[in-house]
Amino acid sequence: DDLGIRLYRVPVYWDRVEKTQGEFDWTEYDWIVKQSEQKNIELVFALGYRVPRWPECHSPGWVDALSEEEKQRAILNLLKSSVDHFKSSPAIIRWQVENEPFLAVFGECPPLDENFYRQEIDLVRSLDARPIQVTESGELSAWLNGAAVADILGVSMYRTVYNPFIGYTQYPLSGKFYRRKAQYIRNLVDDVIISELQAEPWGPDVYQENGDD
């Protein structure tokens, strides 16, 4: 209320909502949705295995014992259960499926299976008519992969970053860099937005788990 922000992206963390396989607890997110509805706040729900916050992939412990095929079925079940539970809320304006799925150089995640990712997109589309948001790195991607499957393309914008090998570095990129990339793929999507905007440089502790707080 103090900040006056009226649009939030909400990551749904798998390890919080399905601690036991097949048993979902939506209590935390039901509260967020209810508060948003009461305050006329719009939400983008980020769903899937890989969602914002280091280490990006947040799976419950029981997933470790699954085969790859079983794991994919569990992810699809997570998506279906999430959309079915929340799609009645008018506060949610679109679904984000995974987070920067084509970015292989950040996060502790397995390699992307592009065919399976398209299955995820298709499943969410079949469950609800809201737009699908796909996110890409603003600096480390041409945005074409995300634009090919998205309704809304969200891009990150970082200026000063930390690398454990070379320390701090700054991207020598102007606003024209992002604008031209957006113009290049504009006909492929309904809109291009900034989904992450850096507020301050990250430091070495970005590679550590920060906990629930």
Please place each PLM-identified region on the residue numbering:
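Short, acidic/polar
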Residues: 1-2, 75-83, 136-146, 212-213
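Aromatic-lined substrate-binding rim segments of carbohydrate-active enzymes
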Residues: 1-61, 109-133, 148, 171-173
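A structural motif corresponding to the C-terminal end of an alpha-helix
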Residues: 3, 35-42, 81-93, 120-130, ...
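Hydrophobic faces of well-ordered beta-strands that scaffold small-molecule active sites
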Residues: 8-10, 43-47, 93-97, 132-134, ...
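Solvent-exposed loop/turn segments at secondary-structure junctions
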Residues: 13-17, 49-53, 99-104, 138-141, ...
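The substrate-binding groove and active-site-proximal loops of carbohydrate-active enzymes
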Residues: 13-26, 60-74, 98-112, 160-176, ...
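Active-site groove signature of glycoside hydrolases
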Residues: 49-57, 75-110
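Glycoside hydrolase catalytic-domain groove-lining segments
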Residues: 114, 119, 126-206
